[in-house]
């Protein structure tokens, strides 16, 4: 049996077509591909991405580890901001893509692909051996949504204004 995200009951109640993906029962559509595509292109859409991996990297060595595993310069990443990039390997190939969030001073969160959670964790752990940052896998304890579309920012500002 596949795992289910925290939002699974809501997906089922709203009539989502659910399919197996990366060990989870995930919604693939509610009404129709074209209609849902246009809603996101012209308005705002919400996606359950709770099946993704989430790793906390923290402590005084956190930035050093992020710099070691990321194709981007995370020293330019301000708290509250994120970078999309990849984890390059030592041969110049790519281990996986990822999103790095700078949560606050000395704390970052990496979002990894659902199908590669263990592989990515192992790569980051091996890269951390000479660095010593604190690493915590919160994948099984975290729900995650993605909000996309040209009206996403305005919609989120209504829900969580700054200050």
Cite the ranges covered by each PLM segment.
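Basic, glycine/lysine-rich polyanion-binding surfaces/domains
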Residues: 1-163
